[in-house]
């Protein structure tokens, strides 16, 4: 399998039997929006596929439950920071479940790792990669200026202009970023440097460093908006501490737009996941994200949502026709995990998750199954529906194509057919209503 690495700007081979993976999690001060869902759906599709190829996954995600935004939210709502973070952590996990996203193997709250965070920062100070200044601690970029910005591609002199950084006259160098900040507001912890809180960029790298035992991980995933400064600053801290790369492959998903406009609070077009799910099929967002390569920007338009709805309508109708066809022809269906269609699916997925071609393959399968039903051809029917079901399952679509039924359903359907044949329409209509309710007609 090959995946596009943002650092080398090339597709890199992934040929391991065990994959260590990290994806940046949410800062839990609000409900997540559909842009936040893109990287976690990307990881879900990737890990489901790798598992289908018998590859073991060790997937870690953080939850940032200490942050200035959480403090402000707590003050505005007259609640504690813990109450805010617990509320939105619960909401985040519920959103994952609603989107049929498998939870990571390990989720770690940043607040649970404060002692380790302080030690990590102290270690960077001890090796002169960071320095303390009046209770604040900053990373010393000048020591690593030959490595810094290799991920984002920015030039240091462009950043120094102040366009991409916050200017702080206290620092040795304007690009030096905060590892520990002295504060008297909100929850704080004691440290070698005094009372304060860790910087956001240190939180993720500490978890990676500790959980994966100071080793380079295979894949780091996140949105393109986090490439700089967050991922850049994660990477440089890991290099400073361990003298090795943080990740072999950096996966970055593209930006989202809503009807050709940037999603932003000022435009009032931010769509929360929980609201999107109430309005649309729970699988719609996944289908939308799969229509284009994950690295590309994506415009979510009314037309694209309409196309998604039509896709699921096709599958619903196909499910009904498939069950009827199986009953009429008394077919025995067994699950098949090997076919030319599944081989083609694997080839597309191996090519940097070429999911747009996968969706085309699914459409071809739907057309072929419909043709077999129309022409009453039962040859290869088992292979066709098994291939379709397998591919949809690996992609993480839930309850979109069902060809299984109980013995009672078969008996009811055959009885209905006989009543229609015998022109006992009143009795047939009663059974027909039952079959419609159960999704057979």
From Swiss-Prot:
InterPro entries named among the record's database cross-references: Cys-tRNA-ligase, Cys-tRNA-synt_Ia_DALR, Cys-tRNA/MSH_ligase, Rossmann-like_a/b/a_fold, tRNA-synt_1_cat_dom, tRNAsynth_Ia_anticodon-bd
Flavoprotein in keyword set: no
Main localization of the protein described in the UniProt heading: cytoplasm
Cofactor(s) for this UniProt protein: Zn(2+)
Record's catalysed reaction(s): tRNA(Cys) + L-cysteine + ATP = L-cysteinyl-tRNA(Cys) + AMP + diphosphate
Keywords of the record: Aminoacyl-tRNA synthetase, ATP-binding, Cytoplasm, Ligase, Metal-binding, Nucleotide-binding, Protein biosynthesis, Zinc
Localization terms from the record: Cytoplasm
Residues at which ATP binds: 265
UniProt GO MF annotations: ATP binding; cysteine-tRNA ligase activity; zinc ion binding
Motif placement: 'HIGH' region: 26-36
Entry EC no(s): 6.1.1.16
Gene3D superfamilies in UniProt: Cysteine-tRNA ligase, C-terminal anti-codon recognition domain (1.20.120.1910), HUPs (3.40.50.620)
Motif window: 'KMSKS' region: 262-266
Pfam families on file: DALR_2, tRNA-synt_1e
GO terms under biological process: cysteinyl-tRNA aminoacylation
Highest taxon of source: Bacteria
Matches recorded under PANTHER family: CYSTEINE--TRNA LIGASE, CYTOPLASMIC (PTHR10890:SF3), CYSTEINYL-TRNA SYNTHETASE (PTHR10890)
Similarity comment text for this entry: Belongs to the class-I aminoacyl-tRNA synthetase family.
Protein known as: Cysteine--tRNA ligase
Annotated source species: Mycoplasma capricolum subsp. capricolum (strain California kid / ATCC 27343 / NCTC 10154)
Organism phylogeny: Bacteria, Bacillati, Mycoplasmatota, Mollicutes, Mycoplasmataceae
């Amino acid at each position: 399998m090959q995946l596009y690495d943002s650092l080398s700007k090339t597709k890199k081979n992934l040929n391991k039997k065990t994959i260590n993976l990290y994806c940046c999690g949410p800062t839990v001060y609000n409900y997540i929006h559909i842009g936040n869902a893109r990287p976690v759906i990307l990881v879900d599709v990737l890990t489901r596929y790798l598992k289908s190829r018998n590859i073991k996954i060790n997937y870690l995600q953080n939850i940032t439950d200490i942050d200035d935004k959480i403090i402000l939210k707590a003050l505005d709502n007259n609640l504690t920071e813990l109450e805010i973070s617990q509320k939105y952590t619960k909401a985040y996990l519920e959103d994952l479940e609603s989107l049929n996203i498998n939870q990571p193997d390990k989720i770690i709250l940043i607040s649970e790792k404060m002692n380790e965070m302080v030690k990590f920062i102290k270690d960077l100070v001890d090796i002169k990669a960071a320095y303390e200044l009046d209770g604040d601690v900053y990373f010393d970029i000048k020591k690593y200026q030959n490595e810094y910005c290799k991920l984002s591609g920015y030039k240091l002199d462009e950043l120094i202009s102040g366009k991409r950084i916050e200017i702080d006259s206290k620092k040795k160098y304007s690009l030096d970023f905060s590892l520990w900040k002295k504060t008297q507001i909100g929850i704080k912890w004691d440290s070698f440097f005094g009372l304060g809180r860790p910087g956001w960029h240190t939180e993720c790298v500490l978890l990676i460093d500790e959980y994966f035992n100071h080793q380079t991980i295979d894949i780091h995933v996140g949105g393109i908006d986090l490439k700089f400064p967050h991922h850049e600053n994660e990477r440089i801290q890991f290099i400073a501490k361990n003298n090795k790369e943080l990740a072999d492959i950096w996966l970055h998903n593209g930006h989202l737009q809503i009807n050709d406009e940037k999603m932003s609070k000022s435009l009032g077009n931010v769509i929360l996941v929980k609201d999107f799910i109430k309005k649309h099929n729970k699988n719609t967002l996944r289908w939308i994200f799969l229509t284009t390569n994950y690295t590309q920007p994506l415009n979510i338009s009314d037309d694209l949502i309409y196309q998604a709805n039509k896709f699921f309508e096709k599958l619903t109708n196909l499910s009904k026709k498939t069950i009827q066809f199986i009953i009429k022809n008394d077919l025995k269906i067994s699950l098949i995990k090997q076919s030319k269609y599944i081989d083609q699916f694997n080839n597309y997925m191996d090519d940097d998750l070429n999911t747009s071609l996968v969706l085309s393959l699914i459409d071809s399968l739907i057309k072929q199954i419909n043709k077999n039903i129309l022409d009453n051809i039962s040859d290869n029917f088992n292979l066709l529906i098994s291939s379709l079901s397998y591919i949809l399952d690996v992609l993480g679509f839930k309850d979109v194509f069902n060809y299984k039924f109980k013995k009672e359903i078969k008996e009811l359907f055959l009885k209905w057919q006989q009543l229609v044949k015998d022109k006992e329409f009143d009795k047939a209509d009663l059974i027909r209503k039952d079959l419609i309710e159960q999704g057979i007609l």
